[in-house]
């Protein structure tokens, strides 16, 4: 058992008309129905396209953002959270429609812990009780004030991965963004290429300076983390327009697109600070591809 050191909040706003908002979004964490919240974080404006239609955002919450606790230096132990401990709310009547939400944390012992995930909040049918048609607003005629995202569990090395979730931000420096495509390839230890995916253009500001992106990727052959080694995961760029990431995270999901809501999330790559250099097929500017380090602090059961 260990308290959280950092919480990450990734989101994608729906691409339908009037889905974006100028109202502030708030993340609330409460432990087992306690009388006081342990986290009540209202997100300020950033250099990202905050909650704009069709855009992704990625925010970091640190220890300093948590409410003071009875024990100095403590935040919250993920094992103390229940199905309604985490809520996402809005501070204004400008309605917001989120499409996808992912919240995870890093414990003080270094373990990466998935906390909540909704892959599709605007679908027509809620599978297995999944929320659909979520809209937030302080105007009760437009939406709800808050909702509880679906809790997920940390997957171990035996969980079969059927879909991928990648979140990233591009550096906020001159010429960091790119118009080039990036690709992800994952090769199992037996030589099988289980993922070979080029990320297409989306409604997001793809790989643009200071912007966040949230992408799902299909899995060609289901696999487990136990079938990977240090050289299994490779990220490449398909052109000479250089790209400089700021951070990148990759997770495996236990269910494919259109299936049941994922129960397990397997952390694969966790780079809160990108240190692998510039990507470009022009060797004068960077490397055409890099091996992404496989996260080694997964729980081995």
Predicted regions, residues:
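Regulatory, non-catalytic segments
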Residues: 1-301
């Amino acid at each position: 058992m260990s308290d959280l050191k950092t919480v990450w909040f990734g989101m994608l706003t729906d691409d339908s008309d009037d889905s974006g908002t100028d109202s502030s979004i708030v993340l609330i964490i409460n432990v087992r129905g306690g009388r006081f919240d342990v986290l009540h974080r209202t997100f300020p404006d950033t250099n990202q396209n905050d909650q704009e239609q069709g855009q992704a955002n990625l925010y970091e919450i640190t220890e300093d953002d948590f409410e003071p606790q009875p024990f100095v230096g403590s935040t919250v132990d993920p094992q103390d959270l229940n199905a309604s401990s985490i809520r996402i709310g809005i501070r204004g009547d400008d309605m917001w429609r989120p499409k996808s939400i992912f919240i995870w944390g890093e414990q003080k012992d270094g373990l990466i812990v998935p906390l909540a995930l909704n892959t599709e909040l605007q679908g027509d049918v809620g599978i297995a009780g999944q929320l659909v048609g979520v809209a937030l607003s302080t105007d009760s005629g437009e939406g709800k004030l808050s909702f509880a995202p679906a809790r997920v569990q940390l997957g171990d090395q035996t969980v079969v991965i059927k879909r991928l979730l990648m979140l990233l931000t591009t550096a906020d420096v001159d010429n960091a963004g790119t118009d080039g495509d990036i690709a992800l390839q994952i090769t199992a230890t037996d030589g099988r290429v289980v993922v070979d995916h080029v990320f297409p253009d989306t409604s997001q500001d793809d790989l643009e300076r200071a912007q966040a992106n949230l992408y799902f990727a299909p899995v060609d052959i289901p696999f487990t983390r136990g079938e990977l080694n240090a050289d299994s995961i490779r990220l490449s760029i398909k052109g000479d327009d250089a790209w400089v990431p700021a951070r990148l995270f990759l997770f495996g999901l236990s269910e494919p697109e259109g299936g049941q809501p994922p129960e397990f999330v397997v952390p694969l790559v966790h780079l809160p600070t990108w240190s692998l250099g510039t990507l470009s097929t022009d060797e004068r500017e960077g490397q055409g591809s890099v091996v992404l380090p496989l996260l080694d602090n997964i729980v081995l059961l």
